[in-house]
Amino acid sequence: MKQRVYNIVMGVVKGFLPFYLFTFLPLTSKAQTNEQMGGVYYAYPIESGIEKPQLQSAPEGYKPFYISHYGRHGSRWVTNDNRYIWVNQHFEDQKNLTPLGKSVKKRLDQVWKNAKGNGGKLTALGARQHRGIAKRMYQNFPLLFTADAHITAHSSIVGRCRSSMLAFLGELVTQGCSQKIEAITDSADMAWIAYTSPEEKALENRTNVPLRISPERFIKSLFIDPSKVKEPVKLLLEINTIASDMQDVELGVSLYDIFTPEEMHAAYEKNNRGMTIVHGDVIQNEGIPARCAISLWQRIENDADAAIARGGVGADLRFGHDSNLYRLLTLMGIELRGEEYNYMDEILPMAANLQMVFYRNAQGDVLVQLLLNEKSIGFMSWKELKQQVADRMHYFEHLRQLCALNTMVGTAPANTKTAGLFGKGSEEHGQTLPAVLSPNGQNFWTPQTQDTENKCVAPYYYTDSLFQGIRNSHWIVGGCTQDYGSFTLAALSGKLRLEPEERATPFSHSEEVSHPHYYAVRLPKEHLKLEVTGSSHTAIFRITPEQDSPIHIVLNHNSDEGEGYLEVDTMAKTIYGYNPVHRIYQGWGERAGIDGNYLLQAYDPIKDYGIDSLCVWLTFEGKAFEPIILKAATSFTNKRGAENNFAFEVEGHDFESMMAQTAQQWIDRLHTIDVEDPDTARVNQFYGALYRCSFLPREMSDVDGSYPKFADGTIMPESPRKFYGDFSMWDTYRALHPLYTLIAPKEAGDMMQSLVTMYEEGGWLPIFPCWNSYTAAMIGDHCSAALADAYIKGIRNFDYEKAYEAMRKNAFETPASIEEYANGMGRRALESYLKYGYIPLEDGVREAFHQEEQTSRTLEYAFDDFAVAQLAKALGKEQDYHELMRRSENWRNVINPKTGYCDGRHAPKQLSRKKTDGGLFENNLDFIHRKPYITEGATCHYTWVCTPECGGIGRGFRRQG
């Protein structure tokens, strides 16, 4: 007989009372008897005499006063007569039956003779089961059923549930309960006693757990011409159901002999998996079953609180269904763990029940003992239990919200009215990713439809129709830069194809699932499903073939320069490689001093392997519906860093546990802000935006704090804090970094310290640091703005004195050498800005990727000066403060007084020895189209960029009428 162990973890309530977190752990991996492999059809083992109740003594001083009960109906016939009829139709052609088939027909005929008209009805055994439970409840707690007891009984409107209730109540009377109990069966109660939500129904409809065995042997044993059986898997499962139900109807008919042990276990496993996914506590179901049980729990909680307030003794008895009981256990957090699924014969046999027995002491403290199928799984304070369930309700609502946000926003071309007006080419794409990641983690695990790391090409576009694999990406999300140090993993069947264009395979968005913690896609031509979950430095891939076929895993690093390294260790089943990172903008094409190092670990036997240029492949012997698991780790330091990250972050995880961990990280990040709105689309939009706010900057350091030195690549020693990189500051200083100071202050401080560290290691505060390098990619000096804002907002966990030193250097000094300046150090065109109070059109700003854009630079430098001034004032640098505040008025120098809009302005032209023209404006009257002195936009919106002085700009417009 299968053994069980009940794990009870003790804690303390109110300093002295024991409470218990409930854990129910099977010791064995599969049932040992055919009856147990019936799963939810397993006849209640206590009534059968196979097992015994296990009641635990209450702590000293506590006496029982109330029982809250929810029971599944007892043993029944198969739910519908039509299921018997459908099976029997296959045996009508006796000429097609084997000798065993003819024997089975006789047995099925006998079953049908008794089953006809009884589909779904309670059997005599089912009634006995409930009488037995009632008898033991009465005998264990007789004082709860006295004449003055307050007892209620409710059932689902389904006949077998009401019959179970009547049998239960009848036995209470037999035992001596003198209290008259009304048996209530009301359709209004279905909203809580047997509720199934629309999202739960949808989950049931989309869940299709495969049978992990071929039905071929089974069908051939029964039919001479197996081809006449059109749904062989369904027939095997339906006959298995009838066979399992024989223990519930007591006909003395057995069908177990027609199944092999492997077929029995495969059916058992399929049913367990399906029930676990649809009703259990697994991350894949997005918390839907638990949310479905909330109304039932609320009824239980309200009834219990009423009983406590009322005083006296009593019981609330409820009779429903296995699915509702299972969802209730899920919501309550009663862990019912198996290896990959729960065991329905242990949790939900016929007549399964949860009894919550309430105890009270003289001080009025209330404890609850939980009895699952009449076995104690511990005591807990009622207050603590209510809080635990409330916390779980909160968690499952957050999980729902996490799964509801749309990760695809920004992956298609813009379709707004202004699309194409201010942006062009790649600027008309949102350039986002539907990636799996930890908030601000090192890697984005994203689907790939574009095979390049080149500038302005995101890895994934929604309008593409061919899927190339899952990329480990370091794309600068939302921008037009480059990916770097990446690799892509593809899963194929059939012919081995190495080139990305060759292995590209059709996919449909209807067969994609994309969440921040999980991505999955079905690839119909490959006959497989590919899934990925991940954390900051690591990921787990799960490839599930749909048929027996070799599965090829192709991994390539996406080096457009054709550089890199690959090695395969077949004994250890590992792949290691690195993809060198190259700079763009300043130092275009040069090595950045870092590599994307990665490690891939396989666990299945490798059938074949090979390396071809920048590709490596592993071939496995794929078995239908048996997942192939691969684990990956990365590092920007070296191979050892990747190995350490692997050991710390992923080695001890399975797919589901990592998925759950990453989901929790996202819940923690997103619900630093709780929003409510009757319009759920607006709520989803908000959290989707917050998801996209959590990509950059990324973690560059390893789990031990090691990181590549900025602008150098030398491996720096372990540090207790994270080192961040990829600050696309022109995009993020206005809103993103101020947001971090509010929702993630510790991380905000680490990010600011990372900027200070870059200054210390590189000599200059960077402008737009990406791929661990100086870039000067965009305009402004906005690291200064972010640092000042963090300090003013109360962030102190960074070296703000050193930060001010760096900010002041950028604001007042220009690099002494052209090499430093060309490398991206210092403000662009600072000399012109300081000389004229603006950057004139004559200064072409040649040592920058974005050349010209003089007016925009002036406006942005004025804002940066204002920001640096605020930190100067806070640190007592009065002289600097006054000078910088004077310079912060420079925005006025590029506002054309004739139009009120910003405009291009020339350097002053000498009219005579003592007179200049003061610097003439372009007098532009086209306010809605791009101009070379404006950055990626038009004067109609760039006029407003100097945020602290929007009021002054507005007054200027009013003067223009």
PLM feature spans:
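Bacterial Sec-dependent N-terminal signal peptides
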Residues: 1-32
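A generic hydrophobic-helix recognition signal that picks specific residues
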Residues: 15, 66, 314-316, 403, ...
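Alpha-helical architecture
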Residues: 22, 71, 319, 408-409, ...
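Signature for phosphate-centric chemistry
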Residues: 32-152, 156-316, 320-400
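Stable alpha-helical elements in mature extracytoplasmic
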Residues: 118, 122, 129-133, 161-168, ...
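Extracytoplasmic, non-cytosolic globular domains
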Residues: 290-301, 314, 318-332, 860-899
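Accessory carbohydrate-recognition regions in carbohydrate-active enzymes
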Residues: 400-737, 741-785, 791-859, 866-893, ...
